[in-house]
């Protein structure tokens, strides 16, 4: 039920989220994390990119504008509709993680698979990562940007577990925040390795205003 609440929250807040992203209301993204994930993908020099959990499509669009062939997929039809309506050289499809876990994407493989703040669950994420090697072209890279555990932990104990979500700092247009599964840095690395992936790089984009990590980016390859 907890994983279902994540999808329900994103369906409820699809329009509000799209507005916040396109109006550049999320300061940490403007100052640090948007540019960081674009650079992380571009540095791999991919021809083809899969944006898993693409949301309203900003990253897929940004990468397509740089000449990459991009497919964005998301479980929320309203977000894919927003991505399509914005106009882009990227392609978009509705697909949830369960579908991808079960059957991949019809045998399609990509030079880069990227998940940008899109891995909030527990078992679903572990199962999805186990599928990633099947989605990568030879020498392909899997890139994840997520909340930095040391910063996101706050005053709670530094151990894996479900946390209640919050829309603190967002507009009143948001409601029903989604729960999310907190992982330590060690747990992220262990999960990547357990999925048949080899961590080749870790980046910690720093917010220039707070001078603290705004996120962590993992770059991995199939073993």
Regions found by a protein language model. Give the residues of each.
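A short acidic, Gly/Pro-enriched loop at the edge of an enzyme's catalytic core
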Residues: 102-113
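Core SAM-dependent methyltransferase catalytic element
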Residues: 210-223
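Short alpha-helix
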Residues: 179-199
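A short SAM/SAH-binding and catalytic strip from SAM-dependent methyltransferases
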Residues: 112-126
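A short glycine-rich, Lys/Arg-flanked "PGG" loop and its adjoining helix->strand segment in the class I
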Residues: 126-141
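Class I SAM-dependent methyltransferase SAM/SAH-binding core
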Residues: 50-52, 56-101
């Amino acid at each position: 039920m907890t994983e279902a609440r994540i999808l329900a929250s994103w369906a409820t807040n699809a329009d509000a989220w799209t507005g916040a992203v396109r109006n550049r209301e999320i300061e940490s993204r403007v100052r640090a994390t948007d540019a960081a994930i674009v650079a992380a993908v571009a540095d791999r020099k991919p021809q083809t990119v899969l944006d898993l959990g693409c949301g309203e499509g900003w990253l897929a669009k940004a990468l397509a504008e740089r000449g990459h062939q991009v497919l964005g997929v998301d479980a929320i039809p309203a977000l894919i509709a927003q991505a399509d309506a914005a106009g882009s050289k990227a392609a978009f499809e509705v697909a949830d993680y369960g579908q991808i876990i079960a059957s991949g994407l019809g045998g399609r493989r990509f030079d880069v698979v990227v998940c940008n703040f899109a891995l909030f669950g527990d078992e679903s994420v572990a199962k999805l990562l186990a599928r990633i090697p099947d989605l990568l072209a030879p020498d392909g890279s899997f890139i994840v940007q997520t909340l930095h555990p040391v910063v996101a932990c706050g005053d709670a104990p530094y151990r894996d577990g479900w946390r209640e979500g919050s829309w603190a700092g967002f507009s009143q247009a948001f409601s029903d925040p989604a729960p999310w599964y907190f992982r330590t840095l060690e747990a992220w690395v262990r999960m990547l390795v357990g999925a048949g992936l080899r961590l080749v790089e870790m980046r910690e984009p720093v917010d220039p205003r707070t001078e603290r990590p705004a996120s962590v980016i993992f770059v991995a390859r199939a073993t």
